[in-house]
Amino acid sequence: MNILIINQPVFNRGDESAHKGLIRTLLKRFPDAIIKVMHEASLSESYRQYAVKDKRVEYFSEVEGCIKFPRFRNYDVYTNHTWLWKWHPTYRRMESIYKWADVVVCAPGGICMGGFQDWNHLYHLRLAQLFKRPLAYYGRSFGPFPTETERNRQFKKISLDMLHYFGYLSIRDHKLNCWQMS
């Protein structure tokens, strides 16, 4: 089994502990698994400190595109024009990474889907959806969503759409009930 881990926060010891626990549990449960952990290039040093030392685990930097691609991709997530990505070389390189994976796991920690409204976080989740990869959303905080601006409302809409795509979801049930999900 090939497992791709995305969106791993590296900002505190709790994130580190959750990451190491997830990796060790996956390796124990799936001894033949190969795990790749994709991270932002700017966070490489943090990942060196987090790394689980095992021959079945590989850490690598996210594909870096042209300087305008992050702005382009985040705008396209916002406007739901993700079909434009297929012409961008960075997107095509990301496609090969995601299609390698049998399952994509959004790593534990962070509140990127809610208060922080991290469009990069949504971008990586949308890639898994676009490439039809099974997606597990594990041990994350989710919401609350501010709704003051159009951008806030669009982020909430896309986030809730993604919530229905996840094959495995591990967040607090109380929070789901607050959104009157069915």
Indicate where each model-derived feature is located.
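Aromatic- and Gly/Pro-rich donor/ligand-binding loops
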Residues: 1-150, 154-161
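A short, active-site helix/loop in glycosyltransferases that binds the activated sugar's phosphate group
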Residues: 167-182
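Basic phosphate/pyrophosphate-binding loop/patch that engages nucleotide-derived ligands
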Residues: 164
